[in-house]
UniProtKB/Swiss-Prot annotation:
This is 6,7-dimethyl-8-ribityllumazine synthase. The gene is ribH. Pathway: Cofactor biosynthesis; riboflavin biosynthesis; riboflavin from 2-hydroxy-3-oxobutyl phosphate and 5-amino-6-(D-ribitylamino)uracil: step 1/2. Belongs to the DMRL synthase family. It comes from the Bacteria. It comes from Sulfurimonas denitrificans (strain ATCC 33889 / DSM 1251).
């Protein structure tokens, strides 16, 4: 049986956009730094990387759609943090942002990684932004890199 899988090596010339949220920036800024670090460590050229900042998680799918529809980007690394509060707002924003991000990958047939933290409290977000649980921004960018390579090999 033949196995096809992506490798963690940047595909030269592929344009990647990091789309991140301004809301909860004290967490998201760490995710963005992790994503940029992953891109650089795997041989990415900074000229092939663009950072787009949106107000919050609900806006991620719309901007991802516009970026991919432009034809200028080969993949998107979506980053943000939605932290549960006392109202059901968390549930609505998390669910719709998650569905919207997934739909953009399917609609455009391009890799869109999911680096949107959905946590119960600030401590969980901090853990996932570079402490106990690693940096989910770094992980989200490695997904982009692997998926771009996989697409090249299909």
């Amino acid at each position: 049986m033949k196995l096809i899988e992506g490798q963690l090596k940047v595909v030269n010339g592929k344009k990647v956009a990091i789309v991140s949220t301004r809301w909860n920036h004290f967490i998201v800024d760490r995710l963005v730094e992790g994503a940029k670090d992953a891109f650089a460590r795997h041989g990415g050229d900074e000229a092939d990387l663009t950072h787009v900042l949106v107000p919050g998680a609900f806006e991620l799918p719309m901007i991802i759609d516009k970026l991919l529809a432009s034809g200028k980007y080969d993949a998107i690394c979506a980053l943000g943090a939605v932290i549960r509060g006392a109202t059901p707002h968390f549930d609505y924003v998390s669910a719709e942002a998650t569905k919207g991000i997934a739909m953009m990958s399917l609609k455009h047939q391009k890799p869109v990684s999911f680096g949107l933290l959905t946590t119960d409290n600030i401590e969980q977000s901090i853990e996932r932004a570079g402490t106990k649980a690693g940096n989910k921004g770094f992980e989200a960018m490695t997904v982009v890199i692997e998926m771009l390579d996989l697409y090249e090999n299909l």
